[in-house]
Swiss-Prot record:
Keywords: Cell inner membrane, Cell membrane, Membrane, Transferase, Transmembrane, Transmembrane helix. This is Phosphatidylglycerol--prolipoprotein diacylglyceryl transferase. It comes from Glaesserella parasuis serovar 5 (strain SH0165). Its main location: membrane. It is a multi-pass membrane protein. The gene is lgt. Catalyzes the transfer of the diacylglyceryl group from phosphatidylglycerol to the sulfhydryl group of the N-terminal cysteine of a prolipoprotein, the first step in the formation of mature lipoproteins. It is an enzyme of class 2 (transferase). The keyword Membrane applies. Pathway: Protein modification; lipoprotein biosynthesis (diacylglyceryl transfer). InterPro entries: Lgt. It comes from the Bacteria. It is found in: Cell inner membrane.
Length: 267
């Protein structure tokens, strides 16, 4: 029966070992994501007719980097592994164990954007609209890092593309990390960057990002394996879905308000 399904490629999570220092693929994916965001952000700044400078983008992405790292790790620990943290507080600093939470990273980025907007005397929603289209590609790379780490795999299935993950008991499972890489990474990236090709009401780009990510994450959660630390099969929705619902609702509200204010200003 196992011959009917794909075998996990079993890539070493450590890309490079230099003495006691280990360079993990997961970390490389995050660095590539930030590198791409920096390249695209500076390119957009140069074409912004002076609205943004490269120096301002540098400051925004530097603050955003720390917002993602600190918020993402703290969010992962407090949303999903708080019991483990109570037993082993140093677990918080072992990023390669358990990884990062998107929802925590989002909160960290919001704090970074608030701080940067204040320093640059800029409207918060203008900052949020600028950074939102830069994020999805890095999210997709992060999910590929999860795949390489043999973590966050999906539920048992008999679909032809099911993969037998070693840490998943070599049972055929949905490669849900790759589903997220495609939807939250590539698809959302093209949606947002297509949307901004025309001038849009301030705040609407950030709102669309929240709606898009929330919807895609909510859908993929139906294919991800339940986390026994926070969910059981009897639960109606998962922790990830519960955290995504406010994003969807909030994003819709932001878009409606943005278009309403834009309409009033043009009347």
């Amino acid at each position: 029966m196992s011959e009917q399904f794909l075998t996990f490629p079993n890539i070493d999570p450590v890309a490079l070992q230099l003495g006691p220092v280990s360079l993990h693929w997961y970390g490389i994916m995050y660095l590539l994501g930030f590198g791409f965001a920096y390249w695209l952000g500076t390119k957009r700044a140069k074409n912004s007719n002076g609205v943004w400078s490269v120096e301002q983008v540098d400051q925004l992405l530097f603050n955003g980097f720390w917002g993602v790292v600190l918020g993402g790790r703290i969010g992962d620990v407090f949303f999903y592994s708080f019991d483990r943290f109570l037993q082993d507080p140093l677990y918080l600093f072992r990023i390669w164990e358990g990884g990062m939470s998107f929802h925590g990273g989002l909160l960290g980025v919001i704090v970074a954007m608030l701080w940067t907007s204040r320093r640059q005397n800029r409207n918060f929603w203008q900052t949020a609209d600028f950074i939102a289209p830069l994020i999805p590609f890095g999210l997709g790379l992060g999910r590929i890092g999860n795949f390489i780490n043999d973590e966050l795999w999906g539920r048992v299935t008999d679909v032809p593309w099911a993969i037998m993950f070693p840490s998943g008991g070599y049972l055929p499972r949905h490669p849900s990390q790759l589903y997220e890489a495609v939807l939250e990474g590539l698809v959302l990236f093209f949606i947002l960057n297509g949307y901004i090709r025309k001038p849009r009401p301030t705040g609407s780009v950030a709102g669309l990002f929240l709606v898009g990510y929330g919807v895609f994450r909510f859908i993929v959660e139906y294919f991800r394996e339940f986390d026994p630390n926070v969910n059981t099969a009897a639960d109606l929705i998962t922790r990830g879905q519960l955290l995504s619902l406010p994003m969807i609702i909030g994003g819709l509200v932001i878009m409606v308000v943005a278009y309403y204010r834009h309409r009033l200003s043009n009347d």
